[in-house]
Design a protein with these regions (language model features):
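Short, positively charged and aromatic/hydrophobic N-terminal segments
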Residues: 3, 7-10, 14-26
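Short boundary motifs at domain starts and secondary-structure transition points
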Residues: 25-27, 113, 273-276
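Non-catalytic nucleic-acid substrate-recognition regions in nucleic-acid-modifying enzymes
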Residues: 30-166
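S-adenosyl-L-methionine
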Residues: 32-42, 46-48, 68-82, 172-217, ...
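Residues at or immediately flanking beta-strands
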Residues: 120-122, 167, 176, 308-310
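Short glycine/proline-rich turn/loop motifs
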Residues: 126-128, 188-193, 275-277
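Conserved S-adenosyl-L-methionine
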Residues: 202-312
Length: 312
């Protein structure tokens, strides 16, 4: 019997149980397991953000925080998480010590309900303290399992991969395999406002995490005397005005068929409505060199918070 946990539920004909079956008419309110990855040391901050967004069944591990949500939560998490790196959708989790087990369990997942026949699906992988230590081999096995599953549904032998991108990760940890879909696309630190940068810039997600660790409040002065390209002051302004950090960018899952377009439209509309345009902020940024300050001013303008920060 396959010892496997699925994200999508239905009663299977075989001896395993699936957790949730995707259905375009019914899947909006179903619960899905999500994983927000984070830089080491920021897990507690990400957990706090997830709690504040109202998500449930939260658990913390090194490098990530897991929680449950409906499909709407995928959009909400991507738009609002400030310190997380990516939001992954957990498709399955199982034990595997042989390539046969890896193939069988990967094949059993509901790829035919997730991936269209023209999908450009990319397999990534990592392995730590696992019997199956060859990452390229694991990637190949998972890809073969997915192709075989899709061949069964679409009755074609060749997949052109000319459509929407689906990045699938097979992560092995102590012989436990977690298969995920990357709903974010590029890392969430890519907010879209940084068009200019300096040497060794601070990642936006790290900056947001540091600000939240400081427990800064918007009614207090914020001063960054070494602001560089302005990441810390800009992130503080976004927090102070309650601006969702992902409003100015797109996400991989926005193009996926099984997530209704109105989910993203509704969550973006709600995020815009939540902005506090009247917040009175006292934020300063300065640097020993004039060039980074000019870059910081432009980045702040791109982020829509240039009227909230004084750069000198």
């Amino acid at each position: 019997m396959l010892n496997i946990q699925f994200l999508f539920a239905k009663k299977a004909k075989k001896s395993y149980t699936v957790v949730n079956k995707l259905n375009k008419q019914e899947n909006k309110m179903k619960k899905y397991k999500l994983q927000a990855t984070a830089s080491f040391g920021l897990e507690a901050v990400v957990k706090r953000e997830i709690e504040n967004l109202g998500f449930e069944n939260i658990s913390v591990s090194d490098g990530y925080v897991e929680f449950t949500s409906d499909l709407r939560g995928i959009a909400k998490a991507n738009l609002w998480l400030r310190s997380a790196d990516k939001v992954l959708m957990i498709i399955g989790r199982f034990q595997a010590v042989t390539y046969e087990e890896l193939f069988d369990n990967s094949y059993a997942l509901p790829w035919d309900e997730l991936i269209p026949k023209d999908a450009n699906f990319i397999i990534t992988g990592k392995s730590f303290k696992s019997t199956l230590s060859s990452v390229p081999a694991c990637q190949s096995i998972v890809e073969k399992a997915i192709i075989k599953k899709l061949q069964t549904k679409y009755a074609i032998s060749h997949f052109p991969k000319t459509g929407v991108e689906y990045t699938i990760q097979a992560a092995l940890l102590k012989n436990t395999v977690t298969i995920t879909l990357n709903t974010s696309g590029p890392s969430l630190h890519k907010r879209g406002y940084r068009h200019g940068q300096v040497i060794a810039p601070l990642k936006e997600t790290m900056a947001a995490g540091l600000i939240q660790l400081s427990y800064w409040k918007k009614d207090r002065i914020f001063l960054d005397p070494c602001c560089g390209s302005g990441t810390l002051p800009i992130e503080a302004a976004l927090i102070g005005r309650n601006i969702a950090p992902g409003l100015s960018r797109k996400f991989a899952a926005e193009l996926w068929d099984f997530i209704p377009k109105e989910v993203w439209q509704d969550e973006r509309k709600a995020a815009y409505s939540a902005i506090d345009y009247d917040a009175e902020l006292t934020i300063y940024g300065s640097d020993i060199n004039a060039h980074p300050v000019e870059i910081a001013k432009q980045n702040a303008e791109n982020a829509g918070v240039d009227d909230s920060i004084v750069f000198r």
